[in-house]
Amino acid sequence: MMTRTKFVMLLTAAAFAAGFALAQTTSKTAREPQFENAEVKVWKSVVLPNDPLPLHRHEHPRVIIALAGGTMKIQDDSGQSEIHQWQSGKAYWLPSNPPGTLHQDINIGEKPIEVIVVELQNAK
């Protein structure tokens, strides 16, 4: 029986491989679904410099795997923000968003940021 940790690791590796070739042709900020089941939701996001993702929220915590790292500003709908420095090939933990808040991801660097996001559907 596959443990949840092994499953997430396997899923992450598969998403990384599937998304890598696609990233080479992306010309705008985009979010592309990769996989979803009752346990996880996985997508790839490519965020171009100064071309933020629309306001959105995350009900569940998530792991960010940086395919192409950079400096990401996460700004909520009240204007508060935090800066994340993501290194290529590294994974990062982000908690779920506080109730009733929205945020947007803004690449404040000079090169596209590409990440795989693994959102844990059963965690709060």
Predicted segments with their positions:
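Bacterial N-terminal signal peptides
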Residues: M9-G19
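Boundary at the C-terminal end of the N-terminal hydrophobic targeting segment
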Residues: A21-A23
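Histidine-centered metal-chelating micro-motifs
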Residues: N50-P54, K90-D105
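Glycine- and acidic-residue-biased ligand/ion/polar-headgroup-sensing regions
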Residues: H58-S78
